[in-house]
Amino acid sequence: MLPQALEDAVKVAWVLCYSALLLVALAAAPQQRALQTPKEHTTRTRVVLLGTGTPVPDPERSGPATAIVVDNSAYLVDFGPGVMRRAKAAVLDRHIAALEPGNLKVAFATHLHSDHTAGYSDLIFTGWTAGRRTPLEVYGPTGLHSMTEHLLQAYRIDIETRTNPEGDQRSNPDGWKVNSHEIKSGVIYRDANVIVTAFPTKHAMESYGYRFDTPDRSVVISGDTSPTEETINACHGCDVLIHEARAVEMFAKLPEDRRSFGAKNHTTSEQLAALATKAKPGLLIVYHAWISWWPSVEAAGDQPVVLTSGGLHSTPDVLQREIGSRYSGNFVIGRDLDVY
């Protein structure tokens, strides 16, 4: 048995050793100013990331779709592939009843690229068959009327079958209808919960970002865009800014034609850090980023499986590092079904 003094010295040595190892581990860990797991939500207004992905299919990330939920009402921004399945997942996994498919009645499109709108028919018809009894109200840029009319025409047989008063598969007569509203900048929507203001963004077609002012929060979402003063002005100290980004490391590896397109129509991590420094949001959420939690290339027998289509994905830690080295504010790299 060790003398008491020696035993005490050994205990002290173990404590000092453990503390030193802990400090080394903390120093080696990536510096993250943001919460990687959203805290329990206590405000009336919640931001729900239904889809944070890109045009490239990724089993972890649905197409772009974000819900602003105020009390028991939900407002959808964009409706990429998988939107209604993700909405139901938010009901089951996050207990947000406002996102029941039949409850989705108001939506906003930032622009009409297919990766942001491929879930439009799903929003219309799944919401209808799930119980929506009033026309869907959808706001967006020029071309929304035409897209809506063509979708309804494409599903005419389904509509006629489900609304036939003598048929066996009857649904309510109004839930399939859509009131589409083509917008310009300014206040475009208001109700008892929210005022929605559209502002122009810079992308390959007519595009808008949106600011939501609710009783307790202000939320701005960019959609696809290169950095703009309009986005900075729309936020101007907002509670939450949701903005797209691409890692500089990945961007530099793209072919020249894609770099040229990206420079005009998207935002790099460095640019986003500079924009957020000026806009001063309480929380910056990075979404629609060309990243993947899956390896870029995996072996499948003798054939490689590539997640991208003629391009590259970065990893979340690269984007985290690039933004964190230039931005001192609170930020997160968003994942599907995160709630803030």
Locations of regions flagged by a protein language model:
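Residue-level micro-sites within transmembrane alpha helices that shape
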Residues: 10-13, 115, 243
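Bacterial N-terminal signal peptides that target proteins for export
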Residues: 5-17
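Bacterial N-terminal signal peptides
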Residues: 16-25
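Cap/insert and terminal regions of metallo-dependent hydrolase folds
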Residues: 216-218, 226-336
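Binuclear metal-dependent hydrolase catalytic cores
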Residues: 22, 31-220, 231, 299, ...
